[in-house]
């Protein structure tokens, strides 16, 4: 199953969108791409939103028709994540699992916080840098529970199944064995990344510990069930667009509606302010 991207507008502009296509037809990365890539449910599909080492805060747009990837904004301005020394941009290929949802109406019994109303976040730790809209096949290794502004914001740790290291990584302790320091750096990155923007340090559940593969799979299962309730009308959709081209439900759209999406264009990125590359030195950050 091969997916391609359809890019609209210049990167680093308010108009830029990345749609995902299957066989040339736009699909929703939130609703149409299956969570599992094999019958055994051991390989999962992940949508890359933010490639490693980049700063533009891009995400699946929950509210827009077919949920394209766009750059997040704050007060009308494009959002870029700051560089907190010694890090540069994101440490991993960052993205989301399709057909998952962190229900904002449900308080998790262990984190004591409600879901963040987004698809489940994923950190892919393989060696290749991805691209926005890439659909990677990954295997699950573990999960961290960030508490972001009083919401549970799970971060699932995965690796691309085609990565040379993938056969050696089967659970969270293997990550520390083969990639020493990465989990500690991941904890620090999420803890401090909002400080340059005047926000307080983020907190973690479980004292910042990364839970194992079994725990992560339970979280994924819960979020997949929550998505099922969302698309079947059992949960309040709020502002979320449930438009899709494959589910065969009341929100499914036909090809005439899909034709309303503009044709793709491969435009160069717009210039961005050089201060995006500034390093911020955070007191108490480990080096």
Swiss-Prot record:
Induction: Up-regulated when grown with elevated levels of potassium chloride. Keywords: Cytoplasm, Hydrolase, Magnesium, Metal-binding, Stress response. Its EC number is 3.6.1.1. It is an enzyme of class 3 (hydrolase). Its cofactor is Mg(2+). Residues 244-269 are annotated as: Disordered. InterPro entries: Pyrophosphatase, Pyrophosphatase_sf. It is found in: Cytoplasm. One of its GO terms (biological process) is phosphate-containing compound metabolic process. CDD domains: pyrophosphatase. The keyword Transmembrane does not apply. Gene3D superfamilies: Inorganic pyrophosphatase. Involved in osmoadaptation. This is Inorganic pyrophosphatase. It comes from Emericella nidulans (strain FGSC A4 / ATCC 38163 / CBS 112.46 / NRRL 194 / M139) (Aspergillus nidulans).
